[in-house]
């Protein structure tokens, strides 16, 4: 982080500073900022955030006892002679203002990524490429909201060459807020699918929300979009920049893929670009990951990263936990853990992947959440898709996923995880060659069932 003194912090946040000795203020320099008292370090500013179900002002005493140098609060909690305090109207907004100021102090190329799915994968792929070219920072895990994005920006310093940020949204204006803090040099929309419909109401609502990312794009910035996705023509109309690049799995775009071959180890394909062509090996399953790789490659190509570096970055990707993560129990028995997230598009992708694997195929489905008033219909659509596939059997758990089992006509619904686990274990033990793919929204916690299943299998 770039250090800031308290006078400057007060100015940035439009706050009121309370301190027992104003003469020493210029000598008090903040070297780190946290919203978590477990991460208090010397010369640290503690920001007390307030949410729907919490108020971090209750942890101010702990922050002081652990050695925080100053506090940023919405209400003065202690006499000013205890510790310097900056009082603001809204600590979450103040956090964003500080992050925006820090972003402006660096010359890093800032890349912002959004989309209905694949944001984290594209972020990780882009990071894997760019870290070979300079000091790179990226969003930790999927902390992509109005708090997570500023917290990532706080870690920027003048040594960073690249910053890769994931921008998520549940409602309109969410991305407009984070992109205006981020002020990206490059902004990318990966795709538009039916997701978070409780907040966006329709696919068009999703598209409108995602295109907000371009509102923060810097002058002469680069806009990138997936030509295979919905509503891309509307994004293009609203762009102010002239630097627009598209990518596609098909041959109708600036950057595209050809000669695609897939296996249960990943895929191989050729990337075509204005800078040349190159074959790439990707150690991830699914056509959607080829599209994600093209997104990352397009970002890199837009800033003239050599194709060989792109090839190295994509081929050396780390395993992405809970995202089509392959777990081989032995030569014949495999679990594919895809419990990171779920919407209709990613469910269909998972079904297609399982279809192309030999042996007995068992699809385990949990609920897809935040799909709005048509959520039952979307679960039935997934069930119908499985019915028309070569998948042998479906296990489901959750309030909505029962519709998947019913519509598939080859499903069994379970009302508790113990019964599901017991039946999964029996399938693993009794089928000679079997692949079990587990898919659900993250909050359904089917990743826990995957971990338990692995343990139970090895005990048997």
From Swiss-Prot:
Keywords assigned by UniProt, alphabetized: ATP-binding, Cell cycle, Cell division, Cell shape, Cell wall biogenesis/degradation, Cytoplasm, Ligase, Nucleotide-binding, Peptidoglycan synthesis
EC numbers, comma separated: 6.3.2.10
Domain of life: Bacteria
Compartments, record wording: Cytoplasm
A Pfam short name: Mur_ligase_M
Major site of localization recorded for this protein: cytoplasm
HAMAP family from the UniProt entry: MurF (MF_02019)
Name of the featured protein: UDP-N-acetylmuramoyl-tripeptide--D-alanyl-D-alanine ligase
